[in-house]
Design a protein with these regions (language model features):
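Active-site mouth loops of central-metabolism enzymes
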Residues: 20-35, 89-96, 167-175, 276-284
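An alpha-helical appendage that flanks or caps ligand/catalytic pockets
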Residues: 4-6, 130, 136-161, 201-301, ...
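Hydrophobic faces of well-ordered beta-strands that scaffold small-molecule active sites
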Residues: 16-20, 52-54, 84-86, 114-118, ...
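Conserved, mostly hydrophobic/aromatic
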Residues: 16, 44, 48, 56, ...
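Acidic (Asp/Glu)-rich catalytic clusters
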Residues: 11, 45, 72-80, 103, ...
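Flexible, glycine-rich active-site loops centered on histidine and acidic residues
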Residues: 13-30, 92-156
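N-terminal beta1-alpha1-beta2 module of alpha/beta enzyme domains
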Residues: 1-82
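A conserved active-site cap/scaffold subdomain adjacent to cofactor or substrate pockets
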Residues: 179-197
């Protein structure tokens, strides 16, 4: 595993990182959510988290970040040591050359700190996915492996008509299926599995490790930590309501806890129920640490990316703080970034 020195690892050698979807709390604006992202990134940097990845979603009332590449620059500028990247860029929407140019620029500005996580999912509904296409008369072509190969070539050597080599970010393949594991293994790429989407992915990670000579595995989980198990479960009501609504075809801002509890009660949803096909780790610091270690062991992962969605930003900060303290991670010295003239 690449050692970027951003945190001291736990006894089980698990690196901790952040996955941020820039959730929009009810009563706040998308701009507020994006400013929360920068604030949380600075806090995560001070706590010693290894990476800060920004997710891509389109047409969602609950998630503010449609362009991770736009947020990576401000986040990297506002932090000192933490690696910053996309979690991920949904490559089928874009030109590989444009993605290479964008992330090559970011890597030049913040050398040694930029990650390019690549995904294949639409990140939105079919209707919005169509709106993202430049030529809407044609059905999108599913040529993801070819796109990924072209993208990597831009970081390898100069090509005809492109007289320079882009500065290279660290490229990761993201996924939640067996196919993504196959591609990651074939291409020899680091692989991050979205357990928060598909908690049955241990076999995919096992395949990847068994077929990739230099495997590097991370797992992204949903987690909420508080001082007590009961308080963490209470805070999780917001994301559980949002998921119930999402599964019904409605994207809503993250509701306040009291509103979410009332909704779940009216709908007859048990207090601890998570929608089928999802897993949310909740609990006190000790409980969450045990769950994280168990999931990391399931996946054979040396790194865990933590996604925390709650209504109150202070509670979200506190969740990451409690987890960092429980694992005993500490910030390292700053990595040089954009020089000031």
């Amino acid at each position: 595993m690449h050692l970027y020195g951003c945190i001291q690892q736990s006894a089980l050698s698990i690196s901790l990182s952040v996955l941020d979807q820039s959730p929009i709390p009810s009563g706040f604006s998308p701009g507020d959510a994006l400013r929360n992202t920068i604030d949380l990134a600075q806090f995560a940097d001070s706590l010693g988290y290894r990476r800060y990845w920004l997710a891509e979603h389109h047409g969602a009332a609950s998630l503010a970040c449609a362009s991770p590449e736009v947020m990576i620059g401000p986040v990297a500028a506002a932090t000192k040591s933490i690696r910053v990247g996309s979690g991920g860029i949904m490559l089928p929407h874009y030109s590989p050359l444009k993605v290479a140019e964008t992330f090559g620029m970011l890597a030049a500005l913040y050398p040694g700190r930029i990650d390019l996580g690549i995904g294949r999912a639409a990140g939105t509904s079919p209707r919005v996915a169509q709106a993202l296409q430049r030529d809407r008369r044609l059905a999108p072509v599913d040529d993801f492996p070819a796109q990924l190969g072209e993208l990597r070539e831009y970081f390898a050597d100069a090509r005809p008509g492109i007289p320079f080599r882009f500065d290279a970010p660290a490229v990761w393949l993201l996924g939640s299926s067996e196919q993504s594991a196959i591609w990651a293994a074939e291409l020899g790429l680091p692989y991050a599995f979205a357990d928060f989407i598909n908690p049955e992915g241990a076999s995919c990670a096992e395949y990847y490790r068994g077929h990739c000579a230099k495997s590097e595995t991370a797992v992204a989980i949903s987690a909420i930590c508080a001082e007590t198990d009961d308080e963490a479960m209470r805070l999780s009501a917001s994301v559980r309501m949002a998921l119930v609504q999402l599964f019904r075809g409605r994207s809503v801002p993250v509701p306040p806890v009291d509103e979410a509890l009332a909704f779940l009660s009216r709908e007859g949803v048990p207090a601890s129920l998570v929608p089928v096909g999802r897993r949310i780790v909740t609990g006190s610091p000790v409980s969450v640490r045990r769950s994280i270690e168990k999931i990391a062991d399931e996946y054979g992962a040396g790194e865990v990316l933590i996604l925390t969605v709650v209504h109150d930003h202070a509670a979200r900060r506190r969740s990451y703080e409690l987890i960092a303290r429980e694992f005993g991670i500490k910030a390292a010295s700053a990595t040089p970034g954009l020089p000031l003239q």
